[in-house]
From Swiss-Prot:
This is Mitochondrial import protein 2. Residues 1-22 are annotated as: Disordered. GO terms for biological process: mitochondrial outer membrane translocase complex assembly; protein insertion into mitochondrial outer membrane. The lineage of its organism: Eukaryota, Fungi, Dikarya, Ascomycota, Taphrinomycotina. Component of the mitochondrial outer import machinery (MIM) complex containing at least mim1 and mim2. Interacts with mim1. Interacts with mitophagy receptor atg43. The gene is mim2. Disruption phenotype: Abnormal localization of atg43 to the outer mitochondrial membrane leading to abnormal mitophagy during nitrogen starvation. Leads to extremely slow growth at various temperatures and delayed commitment to mitosis.
Amino acid sequence: MAEVLDLEIDPISDGEDDTYSSELDDDLKDSIEQLERVLCLVVFPLLGKFLGRKFAFHAWARWLERRRLVSN
């Protein structure tokens, strides 16, 4: 029973630790690239479309209001 409990665990060597860290860095870079793609291809265009329409609506309303004031 003592032999079963006396397991030797090899410490992670520096090379394996660097590989693990490198894999984490690669995964993080991939995740950031995916987030950038989603923002650039989906979020920013939709936000720009929404804000552009809001701005155009308010600009058109102000122009019509000024036109009515000048006409009267």
